[in-house]
């Protein structure tokens, strides 16, 4: 055997070994295709599909800063300086289609801070104290809704006007645990029935009273509504199981033009006291009314007036101006006259107050 034979033999052995190793080598799998977030437009703007599911998700909310001066138009006291408050509201909405209808959820977490003219951390208006609160958390399947929401006594008729100090004359408690069902017809007709836990620290008179049910019997709310291009008319009746009394409201909205609309609401309670869950105005009855005028694409004027049986009168006007899309500045002026039986509850009969709200919605 010569040198040439050895070299040829070694080369052949190396080629054979390489072939054997190649046969045993691990082949890397093909990379999986990246699944980009898909837009979901079935439930409105801002939704996207959660990757790997058919559930649509939206993250939204607002950041708000309020500056108040003058009198407190709810209590009639002089602020003697500026009151400031801030809020960050984080909202999460989901939606998907099922064999039983559309399945939705909605949650809202509020981070609040408030300070009076001395910079002392304190209570903001008729809302929650400074801190964090789960304001909404409910599940909805078709017309069925369960969880923490606002009372149908408020929501079904459309709240009050588009002003900040809208409930100086209270129209009932807001947040509550509830089970409700809303039927929506194809001809503008709708109806609702709700079993509610009762108001959460929303006492209209004292601002501190809880109106939760104290047994197994829930509060009951029922309502009917008809809506068309001209406007709408709605009525609700509520039974307060704690005091065993009832209250009712009827509201009508009329669209005069595409830019100008008016509304009027009347209410009656079988118990002439604001210390209850629903009829929190003074006396047997109360009335609210208002108007909205869309002056330009950026500016909207709002006006609301209210009066109750005990002699309180409240008037508020503002202009909401959208500086840029998503950022609105709203200066507002309010006046309250504490007449009749309300005179003994306040230090001053007349209260003038102002507020400027800065809000970025997203």
From Swiss-Prot:
It is found in: Cell outer membrane. Pfam families: Porin_2. GO terms for molecular function: porin activity. It is a multi-pass membrane protein. Consists of 16-stranded beta-barrel sheets, with large surface-exposed loops, that form a transmembrane pore at the center of each barrel. The pore is partially ocluded by a peptide loop that folds into the pore lumen. Belongs to the alphaproteobacteria porin family. This is Porin Omp2b. Its main location: membrane. Forms passive diffusion pores that allow small molecular weight hydrophilic materials across the outer membrane. The pore formed by Omp2a is larger than the one formed by Omp2b. Omp2b pores have optimal permeability to allow growth and protection against harmful compounds. The larger pore formed by Omp2a may be advantageous for intracellular growth, when the bacterium is competing with the host cell for nutrients whose concentration is particularly low within the phagosome. GO terms for cellular component: cell outer membrane; pore complex. It comes from Brucella neotomae. It comes from the Bacteria. One of its GO terms (biological process) is monoatomic ion transport. Keywords: Cell outer membrane, Ion transport, Membrane, Porin, Signal, Transmembrane, Transmembrane beta strand, Transport. Residues 1-22 form the signal peptide. Homotrimer. The keyword Ion transport applies.
């Amino acid at each position: 055997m010569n040198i040439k034979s050895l070299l040829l033999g070694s080369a052949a052995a190396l080629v054979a070994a390489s072939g054997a190793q190649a046969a045993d080598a691990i082949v890397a799998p093909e990379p999986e295709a990246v699944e980009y977030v898909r837009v979901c437009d079935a439930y409105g703007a801002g939704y996207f599909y959660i990757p790997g599911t058919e559930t649509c998700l939206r993250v939204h909310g607002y950041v708000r800063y309020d500056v108040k001066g003058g009198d407190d138009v709810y209590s009639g006291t002089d602020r003697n300086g500026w009151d400031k408050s801030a809020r960050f509201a984080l909202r999460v909405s989901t939606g998907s289609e099922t064999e039983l209808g559309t399945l939705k959820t909605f949650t809202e977490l509020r981070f609040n801070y408030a300070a009076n003219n001395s910079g002392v951390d304190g209570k903001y208006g008729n809302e929650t104290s400074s801190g964090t609160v789960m304001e909404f958390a409910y599940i909805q399947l078709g017309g069925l809704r369960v969880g923490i929401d606002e009372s149908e006594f408020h929501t079904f008729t459309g709240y009050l006007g588009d002003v900040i100090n809208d409930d100086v004359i209270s129209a009932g408690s807001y947040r509550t645990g509830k089970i409700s069902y809303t039927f929506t017809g194809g001809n503008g007709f709708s109806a609702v029935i709700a079993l509610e836990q009762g108001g959460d620290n929303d006492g209209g008179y004292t601002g501190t009273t809880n109106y939760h049910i104290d047994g197994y019997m829930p509060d009951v709310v029922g309502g009917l509504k008809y809506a068309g291009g001209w406007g709408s008319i709605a009525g609700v009746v509520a039974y307060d199981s704690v005091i065993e009394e009832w209250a009712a409201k009827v509201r009508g909205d009329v669209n005069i033009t595409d830019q100008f609309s008016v509304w009027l609401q009347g209410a009656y309670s079988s118990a002439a006291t604001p210390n209850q869950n629903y009829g929190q105005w003074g006396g047997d009855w109360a009335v609210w009314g208002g108007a909205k005028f869309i002056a330009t694409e950026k500016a909207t004027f709002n006006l609301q007036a209210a009066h109750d049986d005990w002699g309180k009168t409240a008037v508020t006007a503002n202009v909401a101006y959208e500086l840029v899309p998503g950022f609105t500045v709203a200066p507002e002026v309010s006046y309250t006259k504490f007449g009749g039986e309300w005179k003994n509850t306040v230090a001053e009969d007349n209260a003038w107050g102002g507020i400027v709200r800065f809000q970025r919605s997203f």
